[in-house]
Structures are given as C-alpha cells and as structure tokens.
Amino acid sequence: EQFHLEIQNLYAALAQPTEKLTVSYPISDGKGAEKRPSFVIGRIARLLPSISVETESVDKEYRLSARTTALEYAGEQIGGALWQYFEKQGDAKSALEAMRAASHYTRGRLSPGAVRALYGDAVTLSASRMDKARSCHFAYFMRYGLRAKERTGAGFDAPQIGTFVHDVMENTLRAAKERGGLHALSEEALHELVRASIEAYIDRVLPDLNEKSARFQYLFRRLCAAVDRIMDEVSEELKSSDFEPLAFELAFGADGQLPAITIREKNGTARVVGKVDRVDGWLHNGKLYLRVVDYKTGKKSFDLAELRYGLGLQMLLYLFTLKEEGRALFGGQEIVPAGILYTPAREPMLRCARDTAPEKIEKARKKELRRSGMVLEDPAVLQAMEHSTLTSPCYLPIAVKKDGAVTGSLASAEQLGKLSKYVDRLLHEITQEVFAGNIDADPYARTPQQSACTYCEFASACHFENGCGSDRMEYIKATKNDEFWQYIDEVNGKEARSDG
C-alpha cells in the first residue's frame, strides 16, 4: 500500500511541470561507492527512448548561475575574466580582497616535537594509510595525526559488504582445499560450502538478522545470491589453472605469519602491515611462482598512472616481500614473482536492451569480471595461470593478436626487479614526508572534479583552494605502458647516480 502511494505521489510530481522537467540521479554515494539508479529512471528511459542522458558538465558552468558559486569560481583564477568582472561590479571588493590574501596562505610544517607527539618514533602504515599519505598530506594528518573521524550512521554499508564477501570467499576456498580442491567439487557441493560459510558469518556477526528490517533482510539475501555467482566464477577460473591457492588472509605484522615490512629513515621508522586476500602458487622446475590476489567489491582496478604517483602500492609490496621473506613459509623453494591480480567480487551492472540474447549478456558479464593487474611475461607461466591464455584468454588482463602475439598488462622479470626498487623508493619517500611534518593540502586529481577532495571527509576543516598559498592539485597524467617503464628507468637511474 505504501509503495503504491509513493508511486502515485511520484506520478503527480512528474506531471506538474508545464514547460520543462529535469530528472537527476546520483551515480555514486558520498564516499564514491557506485549506486544503482532508481527503477523509475529505467521506466522513464523506456517511455521516452529518444531522450539522451547527460552527465554533469565537466567545466561546471552551472556555477555561474548564482553569485556565491560564481565568486568561488572567480577565486580559482585570480585576475581572470570572471575576477575582472566582479572587480568592475564594485560590490564584491571585500570578498576579492579576502581571496587574494588567502592566496598567500601556507599551512607550514609540523615541528619535530609535534611530529613526535602525534606519531612517536615509529608509524604504522597500512594500504589505506599509504594511499592517504600519497593522495593528500593534509588528509593523512587529519585522519592519522589528529585521529579525526566523520560521524557514521548505522547500516550494512560498503565496507561491511566487502568484509562479508571476503569472509565467505576465504572460508569457502579454505574448505574446498581441505576437500581436495575445487577440481574435486561439483557445483552443488561448492554451493553447500558457500551456504555453510554464510551461516557461520551470520552466527558470528549477524545473530540478530531476523530482527533486522525487511529491507535489510532483502538486501542481505540478494547479496548472498551474488556471492554464489561470484564463487562459481572464481571456481571456473581456478579449475582452468595450474596455480593453486596456498594461503588466505596472509598477514604481515606483529600477529601475522610474516613480520611487518620495516622502513628506516633518519627521522623515524615506518612499519607496513596488512593482509593478502589470497596467495596462489605454481611449482615448476624447482621454483615456486607466486601471484598475489586481491578481491574487490568496488570498481578498483590496476592503474599504471596511479602506481607511478605512488598510489595502490600494497599488492606489489606484498609480492616483492614474499620473494624475500616467504621462502620458509612456502616449503623452502626459490620464489619467483608471477604477478598481482585484482579479482572482482561483485555482480557487474550491465547496460543491455531488454531483448538481448542470454549469450551476449554472459559475454558482457565475463568482460566486466576480467581481472586487472600485472602478470609475468613468460608463456609457460601465463599458460599455467590460465590454460587457454595463449589463444583465448578469459580471466587475465591480456589479449592475443591475430599473429599470436600476447599484449596487455605484462612485465618481464627484469622489469619487476626494477619496479621493486621503485616501490621501495616510494615507501622511503612516504616515511620521510610523514616525519618531516608535511601537512600540505596537495591532493592528487584526474580532473578538478575527480580528485582526492571529491569525497574527502575533512573538506570542512581543510577549505582547500587550488593555487592559494601552498594548496595545489597534483594531477595524475594518463600513462602508457612504454612511458611508465621509461619513467621507472629514469628514476632508478637518478637514484643510482646519487648513491654513487
């Protein structure tokens, strides 16, 4: 009854305009997590197929429609055409003077005493902390120096969904390994293990599930069905591979299977801790080839441009650390890094016509679920990862040309060695900046509208103004494969010369 009343109210609202109707909807929430449009959007699109969907203007011209936002826009280019317009108006003198004065403002640096008071002699760095430090020094200071936190509401939010999916996948694969591996399990047997893992999660984390709202229970049931499909897909991948899961939730740190990764600088020490979702291995000719796998419930993917700027280091860091420290843990064989893979742990959203053939939908779904990452450029290793990879790869982030050449996100053993040195250099740089007291607001950005500021929880404390004082956007430039490796060679070469 309530639903029909809401539909009636919606119809009445849509029928009110006499000249123009604009319908808008968000594509992400306040934290950047993907959101699905309301079913109403789909109905409108089907009723009015000739209407195209417009995305928010990249230049945000709409800011000029109101005086307050237009003034803010003028402040981004002091002396520009819009600034000159307000100068001629004469009634914005105080605002312009304030913005000009703010352009000379600098945040400064923390004193050595303040750094010691906030961080001590050693800081703990996790994947999220490293990314925060590289994406904006001020945001890192707020979150991990002052320990400021935004208020959070109740609910089964994105991080909890990720934890649930990770938990079920880990326990299902662990149970499958104890029963002889995925090759020995039928689809029905696999689903039984999934259900057992879900029940164990409910008993441990959601014992009051039946007391939750009807909406919560519906969303949770839908999530459980999605996990079944995700596990089917992961099972298919591993059944077509010689790589086998060797470890789950492999931890680096005080209570982990491996020690924390220690970075020592003159002004302080950093200890990198974290967990690897899964480590797969292939034993060949006395060598153990390892790949590190990370489950992603969001749309995170491997990006050379981000890696160049020091974001998303953790997977490679774990891989290179396993090469140096993992020998005793995995039987004593020499370890060879074979790559890193981000595995989608979500149901993809597909844009298909209502009459699209099932086989086309499945093909589009497979494409969306292709792994991203970087793998070793070695035909034997690639074929061991996926048996059909040299003819028709389905899972790996590579492609095969008509002449049989393999392209994609590949790296030779030599290149991975160079990358290991580069990652180590970035870790030392992060450590130096933290202990130097750097609190600059210097967010990384793809565009002015797609930056570390876009969903930052500390915007109200920061008041970032690009170009004002020390505030500046650090733009991430798209990086091609050859450009990336050339850059790595240049940086490593400079470091070698300075050491010499």
In which residue ranges do the predicted regions lie?
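Structural signature of nuclease core domains in nucleic-acid processing machines
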Residues: 5, 28-500
